[in-house]
Each structure stands twice: as structure tokens, then as C-alpha cells.
Regions:
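Flexible "arm" and connector segments at domain edges
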Residues: 1-64, 70-127
């Protein structure tokens, strides 16, 4: 396949799959029903990381990370349909968290070692 899909196009693919005239299986899924899929795909991504270390098979890891992204997108789409939140909210939240927990990069904090970073991370997490 030569076409390169964007994040926006991928988001639309997920919407289409869950649309009334989309895929029956995808339409039936709920947060709860997708738990086994989320767990399986997360484990397969971990396996893909280990395989990359052993064999340098980047294609496998790329595919497995795509499967994890699919899970995130499916849960976000379901949440959007339920009026809870959107993928944009997920991205906003994680972006704010990364900026907040890295004051040594995005603020006035300092960190001279990984240990200092982890200490700051835990302190901020407690707030």
C-alpha cells in the first residue's frame, strides 16, 4: 500500500467503523468488551520491544504499537460517542501531564540525573 495515512484519516477510519453503516463487530464494542484486546495488544507490544532487542525486527514493533494505538482510538471514539471525552482531550491531558512533570525541560526546574527526574516526577504525581 503506497498511501500514507495521517492521524486525522486514521481517526476517520475508526469513526467509520463504528458508524451505523460500519462494521457490526466494531459497533458492538464497549470499554468493557475491549479490555481483553487492550491487555493482549499491550503484551504484544512488550513482546515486540523484546523482539526488537533480539532481532532488530522494527516492523513487528511498529505493527504492535499500531495495535495499541487502535485500542486507544477505539476507547476514545466510544467515549466521544458517550459524550465523555475525545481523543483531543486525551492528547491534551497527556501533553499537560508531560509538561507539568518535566519542569527541568519546560520550566525553571533542574535535573542533573535520572534519579532527580524520577524524584521530581513522584513529588509532582502526589499533588
Amino acid at each position: 500500500m503506497d498511501k500514507r495515512y495521517s492521524f486525522t484519516e486514521f481517526r476517520e477510519i475508526i469513526r467509520r467503523l463504528r458508524a451505523p453503516d460500519g462494521c457490526p463487530w466494531d459497533r458492538e464494542q464497549t470499554h468493557e468488551s475491549l479490555i481483553p484486546c487492550m491487555l493482549e495488544e499491550a503484551q504484544e507490544a512488550v513482546d515486540g520491544i523484546r523482539l526488537l532487542e533480539e532481532t532488530k525486527d522494527a516492523d513487528n514493533l511498529c505493527e504492535e504499537l499500531g495495535d495499541v494505538l487502535l485500542q486507544v482510538m477505539m476507547h476514545s471514539q466510544i467515549a466521544e460517542e458517550e459524550g465523555l471525552f475525545t481523543i483531543d482531550d486525551v492528547i491534551q491531558g497527556i501533553s499537560e501531564k508531560m509538561i507539568r512533570r518535566h519542569p527541568h525541560v519546560f520550566g525553571r526546574g533542574t535535573a542533573n540525573s535520572s534519579a532527580e527526574v524520577l524524584q521530581t516526577w513522584e513529588e509532582i504525581k502526589k499533588r
